């Protein structure tokens, strides 16, 4: 499965990059996120509960950031284990383009699933991934614009 999108964030690139590395902001924006902790400068561990069609699962996962070209570009890779529900793993390439006082965020993500999740079918997985991505970025935009305080977003 592959997802790609472009979102305009109402903040300068450096602020957007910092926010995308802020554990509290990420935890507030990630749908179903129960725990998110920084293990190192480039590694996060998380517990997330998600419902995909009829399957509800609690995933334990790890995300690794490659900031070698930051803040213009960075890559993420991650995997999560949902027990009997299956697993998900993927990679994403993110580009942050300065546009005056705003930032254009472009991403391309590739993911694969296994177990019960994979049996649900590609269309359901893709539509759920798009919905979750939209929820993340809507909340992220509201936090970055000041429309919602971080405490309210949690």
Regions found by a protein language model. Give the residues of each.
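Intrinsic-disorder/low-complexity, polar/charged segments enriched in Ser/Thr/Lys/Arg/Asp/Glu/Gln
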Residues: 2-6, 43-45, 58-60, 73, ...
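A short, glycine- and basic residue-enriched loop/turn
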Residues: 33-36, 62, 114-117
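Beta-strand/loop substructures that line and gate deep hydrophobic ligand-binding cavities in soluble
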Residues: 80-127
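Hydrophobic/aromatic beta-strand elements that line small-molecule binding cavities or substrate pockets
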Residues: 5, 34, 61-67, 90-98
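Glycine-rich portal/gate segments that line the openings of hydrophobic small-molecule binding cavities
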Residues: 37-79, 135
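Short strand-connecting beta-turns/loops that link adjacent beta-strands
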Residues: 12, 41, 70-71, 99-102
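A conserved amphipathic terminal alpha-helix motif
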Residues: 114-154
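Hydrophobic ligand-binding cavity/cleft-lining segments
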Residues: 1-43, 47-51, 139, 154
């Amino acid at each position: 499965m592959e997802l790609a999108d472009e979102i305009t964030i109402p903040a300068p690139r450096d602020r957007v990059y910092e926010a995308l590395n802020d554990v509290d902001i990420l935890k507030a924006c990630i749908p179903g996120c129960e725990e998110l902790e920084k293990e190192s400068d480039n590694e996060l561990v998380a517990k997330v509960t998600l419902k995909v069609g009829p399957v509800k699962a609690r995933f334990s996962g790890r995300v690794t950031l490659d900031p070698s070209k930051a803040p213009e570009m960075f890559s993420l890779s991650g995997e999560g284990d949902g027990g009997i529900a299956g697993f998900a793993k993927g990679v994403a390439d993110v580009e942050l383009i300065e546009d005056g006082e705003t930032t254009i965020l472009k991403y391309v993500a590739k993911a694969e699933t296994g177990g019960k999740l994979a049996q649900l079918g590609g269309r359901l997985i893709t539509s759920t991934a798009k919905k979750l991505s939209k929820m993340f970025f809507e909340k992220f935009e509201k936090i970055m614009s000041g429309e919602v305080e971080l405490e309210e977003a949690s």
